Amino acid sequence: MVKSHIGSWILVLFVAMWSDVGLCKKRPKPGGGWNTGGSRYPGQGSPGGNRYPPQGGGGWGQPHGGGWGQPHGGGWGQPHGGGWGQPHGGGGWGQGGTHSQWNKPSKPKTNMKHVAGAAAAGAVVGGLGGYMLGSAMSRPLIHFGNDYEDRYYRENMYRYPNQVYYRPVDQYNNQNTFVHDCVNITVKQHTVTTTTKGENFTETDIKMMERVVEQMCITQYQRESEAYYQRGASVILFSSPPVILLISFLIFLIVG
């Protein structure tokens, strides 16, 4: 009795294994496949509609009949039938055929106006014996003590300079010498430059110009002095023994 049961189970297992091998050896019929009665992948002839509707009959992900990832029938990654990476056919890698070269950035053109402007702002003026040109400032509102001069200044202030020439503050002993030199060179340079253009200055213009430039030179001195002391403080801080020791220890930890 036991032997008959064992024989029955062996027969059932044998039939099941044989059926499984037979199913594995069968080839899939054309048009049949996973979850559909059509192709192997979804989206190619599914009776219930495509999840990703095709655009011209190709493999999965082929909107126009090319290989995988070929929207217009080229090789892999060829959207319009050229070589790999050719968007519109023809040419070697990175060549766009009828279009410009693909993914090749154009060479930037140098703007000479920007170069000249960057060189002029804060640069050393060689023709003025090493003076530097400060940044542009708003012309100060100054009262000269009478209505005529106040009105004259408001009407002609655009003719006066809005930048000053100066040397580094460490070349002067105090603010007065800096301002005196700054006023002289700025007024002289502006007067000469403007006169060559056919415009003359009266004594009133020179008087007002000196007052305006003096205020701007004081402002320039304050800016330069603050920047100079900040640079000096940074140098002193990083040159102190505790800071040097700390930096050396950190470098040792990073390298080690």
From Swiss-Prot:
Lipid moiety-binding region (GPI-anchor amidated alanine): 233
Lipid bilayer topology: Lipid-anchor; GPI-anchor
InterPro entries: Prion (IPR000817), Prion/Doppel_b-ribbon_dom_sf (IPR036924), Prion/Doppel_prot_b-ribbon_dom (IPR022416), Prion_copper_b_octapeptide (IPR020949), Prion_N (IPR025860)
UniProt-annotated binding residues for Cu(2+) 4: 88, 90-91
PROSITE patterns in UniProt: PRION_1 (PS00291), PRION_2 (PS00706)
Transmembrane segments: none
Compartments, record wording: Cell membrane; Golgi apparatus
Predominant place of localization: membrane
SMART domains documented for this protein: PRP (SM00157)
Annotated positions binding Cu(2+) 2: 72-74
Segments of this protein annotated with the region 5 X 8 AA tandem repeats of P-H-G-G-G-W-G-Q: 54-95
A Gene Ontology BP annotation from the UniProt entry: protein homooligomerization
Region span, Interaction with GRB2, ERI3 and SYN1: 25-233
Family statement: Belongs to the prion family.
Function: Its primary physiological function is unclear. Has cytoprotective activity against internal or environmental stresses. May play a role in neuronal development and synaptic plasticity. May be required for neuronal myelin sheath maintenance. May play a role in iron uptake and iron homeostasis. Soluble oligomers are toxic to cultured neuroblastoma cells and induce apoptosis (in vitro). Association with GPC1 (via its heparan sulfate chains) targets PRNP to lipid rafts. Also provides Cu(2+) or Zn(2+) for the ascorbate-mediated GPC1 deaminase degradation of its heparan sulfate side chains.
Protein name, per record: Major prion protein
UniProt source species: Cervus elaphus nelsoni (Rocky Mountain elk)
Encoding gene per record: PRNP
